[in-house]
Regions:
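Alpha-helical membrane-anchoring segments
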Residues: 1-550
């Protein structure tokens, strides 16, 4: 169970505290205890990860000679086993059983929401082209539901085949983009930049192993590029401090410059961040030149294991365990088991054009102009440099969200089903601290008084945009563009907030060649009230709990 809350979280006492007090208490507690998830939460994800692996083994058994646990070494690097791993992962993710599910994915009950949301007519969605005939509405139609159901069935159909043929892949490759036209959230949930790209390689490549190597190398390389901003230095101590396996209070404090007064990343934390960036570049740039078994392969694989092993060992929120395990398996299959397959054996001009676009052009634009591309499509994983939003509801107006068709309410309401009001407040403080500790999150204190007419937490309730997207869209994964003006408009269409009842602070990511963050203050009824840019150097000088101009 979550430990009994501190006296500060007494319901009456907590309601009287302002932004500075809440963040100060929350950040101090976060550094020493993290978010404070109970052991049961981690056991839930351990079981889920085991079922992910066993599910893959189960579908491999449909292929003669595969899927036997006793002699798994004889088939684990079979081509069909690899294809089924990515088809299975695609099914798991597009149904919401993978990342951002369960307690570490900010879902208490129900722990899985995506498929419940995507299969229900009338739920909120974000069409890629608003107003597009048949698919461009803000609420889900029977056509949207039918397309999504067909995608799920197509993935299942491919998984139960003895061998994967083009006829099994064509429906998947056609249906996911069609689903995305109606709701771009589904494309992100299906990991369009990774799992879908691999499936396209299975379908179009003369040698799909060569093509898949390019996809996996790009995943690591662009992840490394995304770390070349000041924001990543803040990610490592925040992620590490939330590790329940890290028991040493002294080591937790050493992650920050001077706990509890200066919570910028320490020299130790920055060194860890630089090491992580090195690994994300070193892994692909080493494996790029592997042509046979030998020292270069062993060094490259060591970099992969260190990189993903560090992420997994921190038991991070967002529940990205399946994706990290899949990436490790992909490294072993593509490079250790098939080192002699040349990267230049793709053998398909259309696929080469596709790979250039999705592995080079899109990530490049996403790093240069992050407002135009999802951080997932730009492969900017774990960078801490993401768009995000703060939704501010006046005088309980969040109750209007009940007008939406949803698979789950807001996170706070879910917490209160299992915890006391004081315990729920303590968890809330942890989530607020998590946001405020990030460099981008320090915009919150800067803009909060302006967005709330000087009355933060007295008249307004703060809800992170992640929690709103999770409830309103059924899926979220750190993608701030899912909770910006498009979702505000879709929610306003159904909930009809009066002027001042819902204000949203929207913050964009830092362009890799820039030094500012673009922000907007939006009223759901009136539109954009104010916008501007915040200098990263100014944000770095702010304390997480500073409120207003510091």
């Amino acid at each position: 169970m979550i430990p009994e809350p501190l006296a500060e979280f007494d319901t009456d006492e907590w309601s009287k505290k302002d932004f500075t007090e809440r963040v100060r208490i929350g950040t101090n507690l976060y550094v020493l205890k993290g978010l404070g998830y109970p052991l049961a939460a981690y056991l839930f994800h351990a079981v889920k990860l085991s079922l992910f692996v066993l599910g893959w083994v189960f579908f491999c058994r449909f292929t003669p000679g595969l899927g036997t646990l006793r002699d798994f070494r004889s088939w684990i690097f079979d081509g069909t086993a690899f294809q089924k791993a990515f088809l299975w992962a695609s099914l798991v993710e597009v149904m919401g059983f993978g990342c951002m599910s369960g307690p570490l994915g900010l879902r208490m009950w129900p722990p899985f929401t995506a498929f419940l949301h995507f299969l229900r007519p009338g739920t909120t969605k974000l069409p890629l082209v608003r107003g597009l005939p048949l698919l461009g509405t803000n609420t889900r139609t029977m056509l949207d539901v039918a397309l999504y159901a067909a995608l799920v069935v197509s993935l299942l159909r491919a998984l139960v085949q003895p061998a994967i043929a083009a006829s099994h892949l064509v429906p998947i490759v056609a249906l996911l983009p069609l689903c995305a036209l109606g709701d771009g959230t589904i494309a992100l949930a299906g990991r369009f930049e990774h799992h879908f790209a691999m499936i396209v390689c299975f379908l179009l490549a003369g040698n799909w192993i060569a093509a898949c190597k390019w996809v996996q190398l790009a995943i690591w390389f662009w992840a490394g590029v995304s770390k070349l901003t000041v924001a990543f230095g803040y990610v490592v101590p925040i992620m590490t401090a939330n590790n329940p396996l890290l028991k040493s209070a002294a080591l937790r404090r050493r992650l920050f410059v001077s706990y509890p007064d200066d919570l910028r990343p320490s020299r130790l934390a920055k060194t860890m961040a630089h090491a992580g960036t090195f690994l994300e570049f070193a892994a692909p740039l080493t494996l790029l030149f592997v042509t046979h078994h030998g020292p270069l392969l062993y060094v490259g694989m060591s970099f992969v294991l260190l990189l993903h092993g560090f992420i997994l060992s921190n038991l991070p929120i967002a529940a990205v365990f399946e994706w990290n395990i899949l990436s490790i398996y992909a490294a072993f299959f593509l490079f250790a088991a098939h080192p002699t397959v040349s990267l230049f054996a793709v053998g398909s001009v259309p696929l080469t054009v596709y790979l250039v676009v999705v592995l080079l052009v899109v990530p490049l634009i996403g790093n240069l102009v992050p407002s135009k591309v999802s951080f997932l499509l730009a492969m900017r994983y774990y960078a801490g440099n993401w768009a995000w939003n703060a939704w501010l509801f006046r005088r309980g107006s969040q109750r209007k969200l009940a007008r939406l068709k949803r698979a789950a309410p807001l996170l706070r309401e879910q917490l209160e089903r299992f915890l006391s009001a004081e315990q729920a407040a303590q968890m809330d403080a942890g989530f607020l601290a998590f946001r405020a500790l990030h460099l981008q999150g320090r915009v919150l204190g800067l803009l909060l008084p302006r967005a709330t007419d000087g009355n933060p937490f007295r008249e307004y309730t703060y809800v992170d945009g992640e929690a709103v997207a999770a409830s309103a869209l059924g899926w979220n994964f750190g993608e701030g563009h899912l909770a910006d003006e498009r979702l505000i408009a879709a929610v306003q269409e159904q909930c009809d907030f009066e002027e001042g009842e819902l204000r949203v602070i929207c913050v964009e990511a830092q362009p890799i060649l820039g030094s500012t963050l673009h922000w907007r203050i939006v009223d759901a009824n009136r539109g954009v009230l104010e916008e501007g840019h915040a200098q990263l150097s100014d944000l770095a000088r702010r304390k997480p709990w500073d409120c207003g101009e510091a």
